[in-house]
């Protein structure tokens, strides 16, 4: 993956084509479903995805909201959010 393809704070993130965010009521779990694969999300991954993919602003704005919501240092939130989003992009679950 080239450095130019990395998701940064200026990016606008969306679920990749064919990927759906679904809740399994029986198991009480949220997951990303894609053709022939799925990824179960923990609470933090779900919060990040909701903040970044449902927002009208960029990833930086989502980081600001998450840092305020969780009363955490912005730098730590930014590092975690960008690492997660780039991992999900590498696996084909999100795009920018």
Give the ranges of each region predicted by the language model:
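Long, charge-rich, low-complexity alpha-helical segments
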Residues: 37-96
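Acidic, low-complexity/disordered tracts enriched in E/D and polar residues
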Residues: 1-50
């Amino acid at each position: 993956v080239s450095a130019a393809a990395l998701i940064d704070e200026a990016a606008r993130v969306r679920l990749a084509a064919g990927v759906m965010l679904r809740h399994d009521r029986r198991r009480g779990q949220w997951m990303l479903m894609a053709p022939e694969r799925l990824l179960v999300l923990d609470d933090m991954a779900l919060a990040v995805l909701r903040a970044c993919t449902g927002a009208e602003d960029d990833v930086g704005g989502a980081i600001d909201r998450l840092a305020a919501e969780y009363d955490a240092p912005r730098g730590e939130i930014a590092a975690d959010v960008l690492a997660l989003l780039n991992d999900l992009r590498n696996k084909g679950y999100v795009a920018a």
